[in-house]
Regions:
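A conserved, positively charged/aromatic
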Residues: 32, 117-118, 132-152
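Glycosyltransferase donor-sugar binding loop
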Residues: 43-47, 235-252, 269
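A short helix/loop element that forms part of the nucleotide-sugar donor recognition site in Leloir-type
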Residues: 186-200, 253-255
């Protein structure tokens, strides 16, 4: 192993897609540029296909050449957890940075980290996107407690997450650090050029709803707001850019019932990283 301090990241990264994977890869690059040796332990299986609500879990971009990524963790195979735990125990990195956003991950991560902790060297830091999930299920608290006992300290991504930790009685060091600005999606594009790239023929105000769509995201409330006569009179349009993780019929019905067909532009798809700048520049 290198003489540089070593960080292992546990959580989604390539070939998996999404905001957490993108964040983890960007963070690893930042640590590498600061002199750390970084290894990314991603999933060999993240979710069984029948549990995943989207079209695919996988990115369509090329594999990053500047990151050391290992597809190692199978979230539903306890024998795999033991194997990965023993491997990381022997590796003895200085730090493990683990992402936590869903109690489903607690058995795998909690078991792996317990085994790693036996080396009495590696410190485990959790970046907590959520501690209490948006969509609650029986057993969530028990699973999160199992995970928590294997963690040395937390970074909370919002004041709400920090509050949720107190609610659950988590008595570990917690640092509140808000989500940094992403700077790896390319430079901004002139507004009308961005709209042309997306095929949007509109000169007026443009609002953007970006990201996958589930009930707790509030798109139904935004569509209700778009029906306000003041919004219509000022010529605003709404771009919805993201994949539906639930039946879209509810939302298409709202669009029709509020007579928003001419105000809503829908991109029902996962937006790849190279296109993201166009959506934010167009709005």
């Amino acid at each position: 192993m290198s003489d540089k301090p070593t960080i292992v990241f546990l959580g989604p990264s390539y070939p998996y897609r999404g905001g957490i994977a993108s964040f983890t890869e960007r963070l690893a690059r930042e640590f590498q540029s600061s002199g750390f040796n970084c290894l990314l332990y991603t999933f060999s299986l993240q979710y069984p296909s029948f549990l995943f609500p989207g079209k695919t879990q996988y990115a369509n971009e090329a594999r990053p050449k500047d990151l050391n990524i290992k597809e190692a963790i199978n979230t539903i195979n306890p024998l795999n957890w033991l194997q990965v735990g023993r491997e990381l125990k022997r590796l003895a990195p200085d730090f493990i940075i683990v992402r936590y956003w869903l109690p489903f991950m607690a058995p795998a991560f909690g078991t792996i980290l317990r085994i790693v902790g036996q080396n009495k060297h590696t410190k485990v830091i959790c970046i907590a996107d959520n501690i209490i999930p948006h969509e609650k299920r029986m057993g969530d608290k028990m699973l999160t407690s199992y995970f928590n006992h294997a963690v040395d300290g937390y970074i909370a991504m919002s004041a709400q997450v920090q509050h949720d930790m107190a609610t659950l009685g988590i008595n570990k060091p917690i640092q509140l650090l808000h989500h940094p600005l992403f700077d790896h999606f390319g430079d901004p594009v002139e507004r009308m050029m961005a709209r042309k790239e997306l095929g949007i023929d509109h000169q007026g105000g443009l609002l953007l709803f970006f990201g996958f769509i589930r009930q707790y995201k509030g798109l139904d409330l935004l569509l209700e707001a778009m029906a306000d006569p003041r919004i219509k009179e000022n010529g605003y349009k709404l771009v919805i850019a993201g994949e539906f993780y639930e039946d879209p019929v509810k939302y298409t019905h709202l669009i029709r019932s509020y007579q928003l067909e001419d105000q809503v532009i829908l991109f029902n798809e996962f937006i790849p990283e190279h296109k993201i700048r166009y959506f934010f520049s167009a709005a």
